[in-house]
Amino acid sequence: MTAPSQVLKIRRPDDWHVHLRDGDMLKTVVPYTSEIYGRAIVMPNLASPITTVDAAIAYRQRILDAVPAGHDFTPLMTCYLTDSLDADELERGFHEGVFTAAKLYPANATTNSSHGVTSVDAIMPVLERMEKLGMPLLVHGEVTHADVDIFDREARFIDTVMEPLRQRLTALKVVFEHITTKDAAQYVRDGNDYLAATITPQHLMFNRNDMLVGGIRPHLYCLPILKRNIHQQALRELVASGFTRAFLGTDSAPHSRHRKETSCGCAGCFNAPSALGSYAAVFEEMNALAHFEAFCSLNGPQFYGLPVNTGWVELVRDEQQIPENIALADDSLVPFLAGETVRWSVKK
C-alpha cells in the first residue's frame, strides 16, 4: 500500500471569484489572497458598484496598495452589469485591459446586488457586444422571484435564463459561477467550450444539513445556499472526474462577525485563509489528486485565454488549526472552518 503524499507541488493557482470588499476590510483580507494566488477575478459588487473604467482603475489601485511587499499578485477587474450600462464603456475597459470580464447579478440575488439586472433583454445590446469581443460573462445563476423556493433558484435559472441566453448568443463565453446543484453540474458538463463553472470549497465540503442540523451555523451561510447531499456529491464527482471546464473560485466573501452572528445575518464565507487546503482535502478524499493542479492552476487560464502562472506553491500534510477570529479595526472576522483542524496547508 502506497503511503499518502506529504507534499503537493502545483503551479501557482488563481482564484477566479473573490470578494475583496473595500476600506479597512480590504486591507485586512487582501493579503490572504495575494499570498497564495497569482491572479484573482475581483467581484464588482461594492456598495457603489464598479460600472465604469475609472472606478475599476481606482479600485484596482486600492487593492494593489493593500498587497504586502513580496507578494506577486494581479487583480483582474470586472464590470458590474446594470440595465443602463453603456456598451462603449465596457468595450473601452476591455480593450484597455482594465476589465477582464463582466458580472451579471440578477437584481437582489446576493450582497449589494440591488443595482443588478432586471432582465436579460434589458442588457442584450451589451451582451451582444461582449460576444463579439470574446469577453467572458460571469453569472450568478439564480432567479429571484418571490414565488421560487431558495433551494430551487439555480435549477430554475438554467431553464428560464441561462439556456435561452446561450441559445441566442451561441459564441458568448459564460462562467456559471459557484455552481451548487447536480442540475448545474450536468448542464456545464453537457455544454460546449463556451461554458465553464467555478466551484467553492464550502459547496464541495458541506451540504445543508451541516448548516442547519444541531443549530444554525451562520458562517456556512452563503448564496447560493448549501443544497442537499445529492447535489454536493454531484459537484464532488464533477471535479474528481478531471472535467477541464471547472475551476477554482472560492467566492471568499468576508463580513464582520456582528453582521454574520445576528438575527438577520449576511451571506458569505471568508474562506481565503484555508480554501486551497480545503480543495486539496476534497480531491484527496475523492482519490483525485491527479486532477488537483488542473482545477486550481490550469483550467481557468485555459478558459480565459491567459498564460499559466510561472511560480509554484507547495501544500504540506501538516495539521494546523484555523484561527477562531481575525481582528478588524472595530470588530472581528470569523474565517471559514474557524477553530477546526485542517490537514493540508500552504507552505510559507
UniProtKB/Swiss-Prot annotation:
Keywords: Hydrolase, Metal-binding, Pyrimidine biosynthesis, Zinc. Pfam families: Amidohydro_1 (PF01979). PROSITE patterns: DIHYDROOROTASE_1 (PS00482), DIHYDROOROTASE_2 (PS00483). GO terms for cellular component: cytosol. Substrate binds at residues 19-21, 45, 140, 223, 255, 267. Zn(2+) 1 binds at residues 17, 19, 103, 251. The gene is pyrC. One of its GO terms (biological process) is 'de novo' pyrimidine nucleobase biosynthetic process. It comes from Salmonella schwarzengrund (strain CVM19633). GO terms for molecular function: dihydroorotase activity; zinc ion binding. It catalyses: (S)-dihydroorotate + H2O = N-carbamoyl-L-aspartate + H(+). Its cofactor is Zn(2+). The active site is at residue 251. This is Dihydroorotase. PANTHER family: DIHYDROOROTASE. Zn(2+) 2 binds at residues 103, 140, 178.
